[in-house]
Amino acid sequence: MAKGKDVRVTIILECTSCVRNDSKKELAGISRYITQKNRHNTPSRLELRKFCPYCYKHTIHGEIKK
């Protein structure tokens, strides 16, 4: 049986460059990835370098609140 809260939680990673450069109107949107993290191993917010199809380069994607 499971004890307490689930250890693995689903998180959303959002491109930090697209959020800051929102003034550009040619951008079609903001890149987001859905993944999971282990709450015990990574209690702080997760940041990963992922490919952003709107910036056309690898950028830092940070964890956002649901």
From Swiss-Prot:
PROSITE patterns in the cross-refs: RIBOSOMAL_L33
Subcellular location: Plastid, Chloroplast
Segments traversing the membrane: none
Zinc-finger in keyword set: no
Gene3D superfamilies attached to this UniProt entry: Ribosomal protein L33
Database matches in Pfam families: Ribosomal_L33
Molecular function in Gene Ontology: structural constituent of ribosome
Database matches in InterPro entries: Ribosomal_bL33 (IPR001705), Ribosomal_bL33_CS (IPR018264), Ribosomal_bL33_sf (IPR038584), Ribosomal_zn-bd (IPR011332)
One annotated GO biological process: translation
Keywords assigned: Chloroplast, Plastid, Ribonucleoprotein, Ribosomal protein
One GO location term (cellular component): chloroplast
HAMAP family in the record: Ribosomal_bL33 (MF_00294)
Family: Belongs to the bacterial ribosomal protein bL33 family.
Designated name of the protein: Large ribosomal subunit protein bL33c
